[in-house]
């Protein structure tokens, strides 16, 4: 029954199994039903195992990254504590250096002041010594100038004798 399908004839249903390829379709569907699950199952199982392995690897990396992050946070807090300790120590050290510098400056100023006072007193001592020397020289000169007028022969003899006696006693 090979009837041509014409546009005028309308829609028709072909019930001949050999002409419609229903048997071919049945064989293909049965083959797919029978062999495809094992073939696709193996492929899907391999893919599933690969995905699970990648997930496990990603979880391991996440765990390691989390541990590294915690360690880094701990190290950061330790470093911050150490930095604050170093800062506090440096502030104490700078304060002690400043105090020591001030103390040395005060001591140096006192030493300079004492030196100035000492120089002043030694200068005064020198001036007094110079004045005494000049006064003694002036007194000796005056005495020598007035001595010839005051000394007569007997006084001169008495003075010489007394000087000799003083020398002999010593």
Curated annotation (Swiss-Prot):
Q: Name one GO molecular function term.
A: proton-transporting ATP synthase activity, rotational mechanism
Listed GO CC annotations: plasma membrane-derived thylakoid membrane; proton-transporting ATP synthase complex
Query: Which UniProt keywords are present, listed alphabetically?
Result: ATP synthesis, CF(0), Hydrogen ion transport, Ion transport, Membrane, Thylakoid, Transmembrane, Transmembrane helix, Transport
- How does it associate, per the subunit comment? F-type ATPases have 2 components, F(1) - the catalytic core - and F(0) - the membrane proton channel. F(1) has five subunits: alpha(3), beta(3), gamma(1), delta(1), epsilon(1). F(0) has four main subunits: a(1), b(1), b'(1) and c(10-14). The alpha and beta chains form an alternating ring which encloses part of the gamma chain. F(1) is attached to F(0) by a central stalk formed by the gamma and epsilon chains, while a peripheral stalk is formed by the delta, b and b' chains.
Write out the similarity annotation: Belongs to the ATPase B chain family.
Q: Which CDD domains does this chain map to?
A: ATP-synt_Fo_b
| PANTHER family in the cross-refs | ATP SYNTHASE SUBUNIT B, CHLOROPLASTIC
Q: Has keyword Transmembrane?
A: yes
The transmembrane segments are 15-37
Source taxon at top rank = Bacteria
Q: Where in the cell is it found?
A: Cellular thylakoid membrane
> Which protein are we looking at?
ATP synthase subunit b
Task: Give the membrane topology.
Answer: Single-pass membrane protein
Could you tell me which species this protein originates from? Prochlorococcus marinus (strain MIT 9515)
Give the protein's function.
F(1)F(0) ATP synthase produces ATP from ADP in the presence of a proton or sodium gradient. F-type ATPases consist of two structural domains, F(1) containing the extramembraneous catalytic core and F(0) containing the membrane proton channel, linked together by a central stalk and a peripheral stalk. During catalysis, ATP synthesis in the catalytic domain of F(1) is coupled via a rotary mechanism of the central stalk subunits to proton translocation. Component of the F(0) channel, it forms part of the peripheral stalk, linking F(1) to F(0).
Q: Name one Pfam family in it.
A: ATP-synt_B
């Amino acid at each position: 029954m090979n009837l041509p399908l014409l546009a005028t004839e309308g829609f028709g249903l072909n019930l001949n199994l050999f002409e419609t390829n229903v048997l071919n379709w049945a064989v293909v569907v049965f083959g797919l039903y029978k062999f495809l699950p094992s073939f696709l199952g193996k492929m899907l199982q391999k893919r599933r195992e690969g995905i699970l392995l990648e997930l496990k690897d990603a979880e391991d990396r996440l765990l390691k990254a989390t541990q590294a992050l915690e360690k880094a946070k701990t190290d950061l807090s330790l470093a911050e504590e150490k930095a604050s300790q170093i800062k506090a120590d440096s502030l104490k050290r700078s304060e002690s250096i400043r105090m020591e510098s001030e103390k040395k400056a005060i001591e140096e100023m006192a030493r300079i002041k004492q030196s100035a006072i000492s120089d002043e007193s030694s200068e005064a001592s020198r001036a007094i010594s110079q004045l005494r020397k000049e006064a003694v020289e002036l007194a000796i000169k005056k005495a020598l100038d007035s001595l010839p007028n005051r000394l007569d022969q007997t006084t001169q003899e008495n003075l010489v004798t007394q000087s000799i006696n003083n020398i002999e006693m010593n």
